Regions:
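Class II aminoacyl-tRNA synthetase catalytic cores and aaRS-like
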Residues: 1-181
C-alpha cells in the first residue's frame, strides 16, 4: 500500500535504528530492525556472533541455531544486511548491548572476498597497500579511528578559534599541497 504523502514528498520514514537511538532510548527487551554490513562472523557451533558495522561503530548480534530464521553459513563478511531482533543489555558487547537475532535479511553480497583483512584489528599490510585500497581499508575500525582522532583535534582548534573571534576562510590561494600552474 502506498502512502500518498511519501509519494508526494519523496520521503519515507526510517524503519531501522542506529546505535545512538538505542543508547538514548529505552529499547531493552524490545524488537528492533537495524541495517549494517557484516564485519565478522564468529561461529561457535549452536551460537554465533555476527558483528555488524555501522557508521557509529560495531554492534554485536547473537545468532542461535533454531531461533534465528537464517542459515549462518550463508552469511559472508561485507554483506549488507537488515536484522530483526531483541535488544539485551550485555556489558561485554560493544556499546553495552547486543541484539538477539530472530531474522537476517541479506540485502546484497560482495562479488568477491575483500583484498585486505579489514575485520582484523591490525591489518598487517603495507602503507602503500592501505593507500591504494583506501576506500576498503577505511572500513577497518583501527584505520577509521585515526581519522576520528584527527577530526576531533581539528574541531577543537576550530571551536577555540571561533570563540576567540577568528573567521574561518577557504581561499584557493592557500592550499594544503603545492599546486601546479
Amino acid at each position: 500500500e502506498i502512502n500518498m504523502m511519501e509519494f508526494v514528498e519523496g520521503v519515507k520514514a526510517k524503519e531501522t535504528l542506529g546505535i545512538a537511538q538505542i543508547l538514548e532510548g529505552s529499547y531493552e527487551g524490545k524488537k528492533i530492525r537495524m541495517n549494517g554490513a557484516v564485519h565478522n562472523v564468529r561461529d561457535m557451533g549452536e551460537v554465533a556472533f555476527v558483528i555488524l558495522r555501522k557508521a557509529e561503530g560495531l554492534v554485536q548480534c547473537v545468532y542461535e541455531e533454531g531461533v534465528t530464521n537464517f542459515d549462518i553459513h550463508d552469511l559472508k563478511e561485507e554483506s549488507a544486511v537488515e536484522v530483526l531482533g531483541t535488544v539485551k543489555a550485555e556489558e561485554r558487547a560493544p556499546h553495552g548491548f547486543e541484539i538477539r537475532l530472530e531474522e537476517i535479511k541479506v540485502l546484497s553480497q560482495p562479488a568477491e572476498p575483500m583484498p585486505i583483512p579489514i575485520s582484523k584489528w591490525k591489518m598487517n599490510t603495507s602503507l602503500e597497500t592501505k593507500l591504494a585500497l583506501r576506500p576498503v581499508s577505511l572500513r577497518n575500525v583501527r584505520e577509521r579511528a585515526k581519522f576520528k582522532i584527527q577530526e576531533g583535534i581539528v574541531r577543537g582548534f576550530r571551536d577555540y578559534l571561533f570563540t576567540q573571534g577568528f573567521t574561518e576562510i577557504h581561499t584557493p590561494k592557500i592550499v594544503a599541497r603545492g599546486a601546479e600552474g
